[in-house]
């Protein structure tokens, strides 16, 4: 009994001893942890940690912001001239590129031959038909007649008239000096074609005629076909009666053709009379000028140029000899005659 009670005590003591050991070890760990802790509550400790962390972050931000501000101030101070120089170069480069684009656009506009292609894109057979039609007056004037909108035929007729005028001046024995004859012929033909076309277009605009400048140039240019025929024949066959016949027949037919076309495109009797009368008068008088007055005008121009280039003739004026030498000469002659006797 005593043994059993003693063993139970020992077992109990052993069991409690293990428990005590565990408690002591756990208690020792608890004491160490508590010693490392501050005498503050958990919430106040966390608040202090957060405040400390916020202060450190603000200091780092201030330091981080302070360095770039100093760098920016230094860059602004040291690189101001560099920035201005780059800006100036960029502006100059933009101006140069803009000017280059404008110049290239203008060059392409005026140098591109495709712009003039529609005005000269015509077949030779079409030109031949239009030349024949320019000698046939139209009968229907109740509706606008069609006008060819091309310049190839009129331009060739103007150059043909220049060649005919040169042929007529050379066949008459006119001496060419310094290209005056060529320049006069080109100026006369092109001046009439462009000048009269512009004047007729101006009158047509005032009289409300339905015609454009291109159509006026084409109409008047093809109207020169009759003039070329008359001048070519009369420069080789010099008969004034023959010229007047061709002037009325051939020149009159080409003029009637132009008048009929203008009549079909003009509304009102007064407007028709002004436009068509002016066109007919200028066209017929120009043919008379080329046959009768053109040669005289050119010869007058050549004579004027010759008079400016020829030097003045040398004039010989008799000079009076002094009286003294004549007296001595006469006395010498008389003495020689007396000795010879």
UniProtKB/Swiss-Prot annotation:
Keywords, alphabetical: Cell membrane, Cytoplasm, Differentiation, Glycoprotein, Golgi apparatus, Membrane, Transmembrane, Transmembrane helix
Topological domains, Cytoplasmic: 1-146, 207-212, 264-272
Source domain of life: Eukaryota
Positions of region (Disordered): 26-46
GO CC aspect terms: Golgi apparatus; plasma membrane
Lumenal side: 168-185, 234-242, 294-341
Membrane topology qualifier: Multi-pass membrane protein
Glycan-linked positions: 330
Cellular localisation: Cell membrane; Golgi apparatus, cis-Golgi network membrane; Cytoplasm
Any GO BP: cell differentiation
Positions of transmembrane segments: 147-167, 186-206, 213-233, 243-263, 273-293
Family: Belongs to the YIP1 family.
Function: Involved in the maintenance of the Golgi structure. May play a role in hematopoiesis.
Name recorded for this polypeptide: Protein YIPF3
